[in-house]
């Protein structure tokens, strides 16, 4: 007599279902491995560390790429966590963390600086804009949410870089390269390292028309309760208004805001 299995009842899985579950588990394992690897890795490293055939690994990466969970760097061929993963994680980000905790601080910074305030997080070897508080000025600089920013040539990107240990910092820069976007983009590694040393010392980074001509940005790192960098907060404005003579005063405002958000996230203030 043939057994009739009701929908939803537990029972032995069909071979196709077993294969589907296995593929899902492997896809999740790939995303978890990329996350633990700083957001990016080569297909051969993924295959080796997850003990998967190279062809299977590549096929799974292509499926994940189709859903925008990963993307492949056209220069190095490395695979990176994509915006699809960010969009799913943004539900968590929206309900807890920098945006929900930092909202009032962002608005205060916008009012005091007179410039648009942005929040960015690191996504592999790029910074991604996840939050914004537009200023009231008729002329204002606003990038769309989800915009990708180069780590070496943006205020937020450099604020995500300068807290990193020296070895990790160099490793990230080597992976990303030093692409020139404007005449003032820093494309020399020793010069960038000195620039980041200065940013670390004063607590904020400066992008002086290094990514977009006519746009200046000042940013500072935001830390969680264990002292890990979780985001960067920045102000951006036209170079004609956010001028070099205002960098120090505005930088101090940005630094103070980043510290306040970090404290609200649970970071214990360090004794002087």
Curated annotation (Swiss-Prot):
Keyword vocabulary terms for this entry: DNA-binding, Repressor, Transcription, Transcription regulation
Keyword Transcription regulation: yes
Region (Disordered): 1-20
GO terms, molecular function: DNA binding; DNA-binding transcription factor activity
Protein name in the entry: HTH-type transcriptional repressor AllR
UniProt-listed PANTHER family: HELIX-TURN-HELIX TRANSCRIPTIONAL REGULATOR, ICLR FAMILY (PTHR30136), HTH-TYPE TRANSCRIPTIONAL REPRESSOR ALLR (PTHR30136:SF24)
Residues annotated as domain IclR-ED: 98-267
Encoding gene per record: allR
Pfam families linked: HTH_IclR (PF09339), IclR_C (PF01614)
InterPro entries: GAF-like_dom_sf (IPR029016), HTH_MetabolicPath_Reg (IPR050707), Tscrpt_reg_IclR_C (IPR014757), Tscrpt_reg_IclR_N (IPR005471), WH-like_DNA-bd_sf (IPR036388), WH_DNA-bd_sf (IPR036390)
Domain HTH iclR-type positions: 21-83
Record-level GO BP terms: negative regulation of DNA-templated transcription
Ranges of the DNA-binding region feature: 43-62
């Amino acid at each position: 007599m043939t057994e009739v299995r009701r929908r939803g009842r537990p029972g032995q899985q069909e071979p196709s279902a077993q294969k589907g579950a296995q593929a899902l588990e492997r896809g999740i394992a790939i995303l978890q491995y990329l996350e633990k690897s700083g957001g990016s890795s080569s297909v051969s490293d993924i295959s080796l560390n997850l003990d998967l055939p190279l062809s299977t690994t590549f096929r799974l990466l292509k499926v994940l790429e189709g859903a925008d969970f990963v993307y492949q760097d056209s220069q190095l061929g490395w695979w990176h966590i994509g915006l699809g993963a960010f969009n799913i994680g943004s539900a968590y980000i929206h309900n807890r963390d920098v945006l929900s905790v930092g909202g009032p601080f962002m608005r205060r910074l916008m009012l005091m600086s007179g410039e648009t305030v942005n929040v960015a997080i690191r996504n592999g070897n790029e910074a991604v804009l996840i939050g914004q508080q537009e200023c009231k000025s008729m002329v204002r600089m606003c990038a769309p949410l989800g915009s990708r920013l180069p780590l070496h040539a943006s205020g937020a990107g450099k604020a995500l870089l300068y807290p990193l240990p020296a070895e990790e910092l160099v490793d990230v820069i080597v992976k990303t390269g030093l692409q020139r976007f404007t005449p003032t983009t820093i494309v020399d590694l020793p010069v960038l390292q000195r620039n980041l040393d200065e940013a670390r010392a004063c607590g904020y980074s400066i992008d002086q028309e290094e990514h977009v001509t006519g746009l200046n940005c000042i940013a500072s790192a935001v830390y969680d309760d264990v002292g890990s960098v979780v985001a960067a907060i920045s102000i951006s404005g036209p170079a004609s208004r956010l001028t070099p003579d205002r960098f120090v005063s505005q930088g101090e405002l940005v630094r103070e805001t980043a510290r306040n958000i970090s404290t609200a996230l649970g970071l214990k203030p360090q004794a002087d």
